[in-house]
Amino acid sequence: MFHVKHFDVLVIGGGHAGTEAAHAAARMGSQTGLITMSRSGIGVMSCNPAIGGLGKGHLVREIDALDGVMGRVADQAGIQFRLLNRRKGPAVQGPRAQSDRAIYHNRMLEATDQQQNLDIIVGEAVDFVMDGERVIGVVLQDDAEILAKTVILTTGTFLRGVIHIGDVSRSGGRMGDKASVRLADRIDSFGLPMGRLKTGTPPRLSSKSINWDVLEEQPGDDEPTLFSFLSKGVSARQVSCGITHTNVRTHDIIRDNITRSAMYGGHIDGVGPRYCPSIEDKIIRFADKESHQIFLEPEGLNTDAVYPNGISTSLPQDVQSEYVHSIVGLEKAIILQPGYAIEYDYVDPRALDSSLSVLSVPGLYLAGQINGTTGYEEAAAQGLVAGLNASLEARGSDPITFSRSDSYIGVMIDDLTTRGVMEPYRMFTSRAEFRLSLRADNADQRLTPIGLALGCVSDERKQAFEVKIEALDRARRLLTESSYTPKQAGEAGISVSHDGSRRTAMQLLAFPNTSFKDLSLLDPVFDGIDVETQQQMEREALYATYIERQQKDVDLLKKDEGHKIPADFDYDQLSGLSNELKSKLNSTRPTSLAQVGRIDGMTPAALTLILAKLRQSSKKRSA
C-alpha cells in the first residue's frame, strides 16, 4: 500500500455529475482529483445524444451562468439546435441541442485536461479511507490510498448495476463497462436508506440501412439558440433528424412477446422513469394508442449510428429486430447495438442536506443518478452544487444553498432533499413555483453574481456579464424614463385607453403585439438598442406585472428560509406532532422552516407548533 498526493476535493466518477463537480471545485481554487475507470469515459453520453429540453435547458443555462462546462461543450458539439415550446411564453421555452457524441466527449476531456487545479486519476475506487465516521479519502483497486478533505461520489448507473436484455442479465454500469460492486458494498455499511431504480436505452441503428427518403425530416432552427452566454455561434455542421412512428403491427409484436421483456418478465425490481417510458410501457399503459412517434437522431457527423428516440426496451434481441423492422423506413434497418434496461442502486436523497453532503457521513457528498435523478442535465447541476460545497467545506467556509426562488437548481435540490424520490426524478418547468422569473434567458442575471461572490467565475465571464448588465441597465433607464400620451402611442400604432394617462415605454412594451419596432416610431433612440437587449427588455415588460405579484410569495419564502433550524433541534419534544411527522423530520433534518413546510404530510398546525418552539428557543439563547 502506498500514499498518493493529498487533495482538497476528490471526485469519484467522470460522467456528467463528476466532471461538473471536479471543474467547480477546481475553479474555486481547490486541489481536485477526478477518479475515473478510463479517460475514455469522461463526458460520455451513455443514453441519448442530446443536451437540454424543457426544464433541462434551464438547468444547463444555470450551470453556465456559474461558469460550468456543460453549456459550452454542448454548443461546441451541437449538430442541431431547437428551441422547444416556441409557441408558448419565454418562461417555459427550453433550448435543446442534438450532439455529436465523439465531439462532446473530446471537448469535455480537453476542458478537463486544461482545467487548472484538476488532476485526472485513472483507477477504480473500491473503498473509502475513514477517520472515525468521517471520509478522508479513497482506496483504489490496487490498494493505493488517495487522501482528501472532502469526497464527492458520482456513480451514475454503475453502483451494483445490472444490464437486462430479455431474460439475459449481467453485471455492468453501461454497455461495455463493468459495474461498481465493492464500492456498493462499502456504502451499504454506512446504513443509508437505499433502493433500486432502472432506466433503459433503445437499440442503435445503422444510418446507411435506414430509408430516409420515406421519413419526415426535422431540421433545426434557422437561428440556433445556444446554451452558453459566452458562445458566439455554432461550431459543427448542422444536420436534420428523421421522424417515423410505430404502428399496429409493431404493437402486436411487442404485446405478443411482453412476458419476454425483462421488465414484464419479473427480472427487474427497480422503478423506471415515468417521463421516458420503454416502448413496452407505452404499449401497455397507453393501449388505446395505435402509434407512437420516434425521432431518428444521428449520433454524430462521422458515425453511422442513429439513436431511435422513443423505443427504449428490455426485450430480447430477436424481438427488437422484429419490431424495428415493422416500422416505416426501418424495414431493412441494421441493429448495431441492442437496446437494454439497466438497474442500479441509489441513495434516498433525504439522507443529504441542501449542500448535497451526507448527513450521517461527514466529508462525503453525493451527486447525480445516485440521488435518484435521471438525465445528464440534472446530474451536472448536482455535480456543480456538490463541487462548490465540497470546496467550501475543504477551506472551512459555510456552504452555498440555492433557493427555489432563485434557480431551477434550487428547486431540484429542495425537491430531492425534502421530498425524496419514488421514481427517477427529472426536471420540468412545472416544478418551479416562480418560473416566470426563472427563465432560461436571465439565468446569468440570477446566478452569475452568486458565482462572482463565490469566486467560481472566470474573468472572461465576469467582463462579458458586466458589459451585458450595463447594456440592460441603460435600456431599462431609457424605457422607464421615457413616457408618452395615449395620442402619441396611437400615432405609433400602439392601441391604449384614451384616459389621459402617460405611460412609460416599458409599460407600452407590455401591450400585446408591441415591439421595439413600434417604440422606434415614438423615438428613433430605441433603434440604438442591440437586438439581444431588446429581446430581454420585451420579456421583462411582458412579465413585469405578474412578477410583481409573485414577489410577495418570494418574500414569504425568503422569510421562512430565514427561520433556520439548529442541527440538534429535538422534534421528539413536541407533543403536538404525530409520530409520522417526527419520523420524517428526524430522518430529513430540514435546515429551515421553508423546508419543513414542504415535507409530505406537514400541516399548518404542525408548522405553527415548530415555529413557536423555534421562537421560544431563540428567546432562551438571547436571554
Curated annotation (Swiss-Prot):
InterPro entries listed in its UniProt record: FAD/NAD-bd_sf, GIDA_C_N, MnmG, MnmG-rel, MnmG-rel_CS, MnmG_C, MnmG_C_subdom, MnmG_C_subdom_sf
Cofactor(s) required, per the database record: FAD
Cell location: Cytoplasm
Gene Ontology terms describing biological process: tRNA methylation; tRNA wobble uridine modification
Protein origin, superkingdom: Bacteria
Gene Ontology terms, MF aspect: flavin adenine dinucleotide binding
Protein's UniProt keywords contain NAD: yes
Entry keywords, A to Z: Cytoplasm, FAD, Flavoprotein, NAD, tRNA processing
Residues annotated to bind FAD: 13-18
Binding site for NAD(+): 272-286
Gene Ontology cellular component list: cytosol
HAMAP family hit by this protein: MnmG_GidA (MF_00129)
Family named by the database record: Belongs to the MnmG family.
Function: NAD-binding protein involved in the addition of a carboxymethylaminomethyl (cmnm) group at the wobble position (U34) of certain tRNAs, forming tRNA-cmnm(5)s(2)U34.
NCBIfam families the record matches: mnmG_gidA (TIGR00136)
Complexes and interactors: Homodimer. Heterotetramer of two MnmE and two MnmG subunits.
Protein name: tRNA uridine 5-carboxymethylaminomethyl modification enzyme MnmG
Taxonomic source organism: Roseobacter denitrificans (strain ATCC 33942 / OCh 114) (Erythrobacter sp. (strain OCh 114))
Lineage: Bacteria, Pseudomonadati, Pseudomonadota, Alphaproteobacteria, Rhodobacterales
